């Protein structure tokens, strides 16, 4: 019996490298603009809320930790909170209301106008993430989506969209966390190294009204 493990490894590495090169070549300007808006939100005293399910929940927690602790350089802590970690709140909302509201209820409690909600869903159609984005827009928050396959229903609810045009969920997730790392690095850059670039964003109304 032939062992095709090495072929599987080679194919995955090849496909991932091709997707990564294409995505970042095409989306560099979008990532820069998104980082500027995140940095401006934080500079104005806002915060970042993040949500997702399964692997996307892990990404939400991972990125929140990078903001709160540090990324590549020592700097002040930045306010970010993953809405996936409070088991008492999650189970109470799911039990008393509905699982589709586990994030939106927290957004209603914690979100403020000018804050940013990051919703992560490889399909772009997770009901509880959609509900959270809708709640965020009602409050006047900026919405950032990490999606795949064209963005699904999330595309219409996001002011900023990191969409990975690929059918493979694992490859989408790999690009998501790499893009998230870049946004952390660029946010630090604009907050602590190139503050002048933030000037046009600090006083602009960055929320597009529906």
UniProtKB/Swiss-Prot annotation:
Q: Which GO terms describe its biological process?
A: carbohydrate metabolic process; D-glycero-D-manno-heptose 7-phosphate biosynthetic process
Disulphide linkage map: none
**What does the record say about how the cofactor binds?**
Binds 1 zinc ion per subunit.
Q: Which residues form the SIS domain?
A: 38-202
Give the subcellular location: Cytoplasm
A Pfam match: SIS_2
Keyword annotations from UniProtKB, A to Z:
Carbohydrate metabolism, Cytoplasm, Isomerase, Metal-binding, Zinc
**Required cofactor names:** Zn(2+)
Report whether Amino-acid biosynthesis shows up as a keyword of the record: no
Catalytic activity annotated for this protein?
A: 2 D-sedoheptulose 7-phosphate = D-glycero-alpha-D-manno-heptose 7-phosphate + D-glycero-beta-D-manno-heptose 7-phosphate
Q: What is its EC number?
A: 5.3.1.28
Q: Single GO cellular component annotation? A: cytoplasm
Task: Report the InterPro entries cross-referenced here.
Answer: GmhA/DiaA, Phosphoheptose_Isoase, SIS_dom, SIS_dom_sf, SIS_GmhA/DiaA_subfam
**Protein origin, superkingdom:** Bacteria
Q: What span is annotated as the signal peptide, if there is one?
A: none
Any GO MF annotation of the entry: carbohydrate derivative binding
Binding residue positions for Zn(2+): 62, 66, 173, 181
The UniProt annotation places substrate binding at: 53-55, 66, 95-96, 121-123, 126, 173
Q: What class of enzyme is it?
A: isomerase
- State the pathway, as annotated in the record: Carbohydrate biosynthesis; D-glycero-D-manno-heptose 7-phosphate biosynthesis; D-glycero-alpha-D-manno-heptose 7-phosphate and D-glycero-beta-D-manno-heptose 7-phosphate from sedoheptulose 7-phosphate: step 1/1
Family classification: Belongs to the SIS family. GmhA subfamily.
Q: How does it assemble?
A: Homotetramer.
Q: What else is known?
A: The reaction produces a racemic mixture of D-glycero-alpha-D-manno-heptose 7-phosphate and D-glycero-beta-D-manno-heptose 7-phosphate.
What job does the chain carry out? Answer: Catalyzes the isomerization of sedoheptulose 7-phosphate in D-glycero-D-manno-heptose 7-phosphate.
* Protein name (Swiss-Prot/TrEMBL): Phosphoheptose isomerase
Q: Which organism is it from?
A: Desulfovibrio desulfuricans (strain ATCC 27774 / DSM 6949 / MB)
């Amino acid at each position: 019996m032939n062992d095709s493990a090495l072929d599987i490894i080679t194919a995955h590495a090849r496909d991932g490298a091709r997707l990564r090169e294409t995505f970042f070549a095409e989306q560099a300007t979008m990532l820069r603009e998104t980082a500027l808006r995140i940095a401006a939100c934080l500079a104005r005293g806002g915060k970042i809320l993040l949500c997702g399910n399964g692997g996307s929940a892990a990404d939400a927690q991972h990125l929140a930790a990078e903001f709160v602790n540090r990324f590549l350089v020592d700097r002040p802590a930045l306010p970010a909170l993953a809405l996936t970690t409070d088991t008492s709140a999650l189970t109470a909302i799911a039990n008393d209301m509905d699982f589709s509201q586990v994030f939106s209820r927290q957004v209603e409690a914690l979100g403020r106008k000018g804050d940013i909600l990051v919703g992560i869903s490889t399909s772009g159609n997770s009901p509880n993430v959609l509900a959270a984005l809708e709640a965020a827009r009602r409050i006047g928050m900026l919405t950032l989506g990490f999606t795949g396959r064209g963005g699904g229903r999330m595309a219409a609810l996001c002011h900023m969209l990191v969409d990975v045009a690929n059918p493979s969920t694992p490859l989408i997730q790999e690009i998501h966390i790499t893009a998230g790392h870049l946004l952390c690095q660029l946010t630090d850059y604009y907050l602590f190294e190139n503050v002048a670039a933030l000037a046009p964003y600090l006083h602009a109304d960055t929320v597009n009204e529906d």
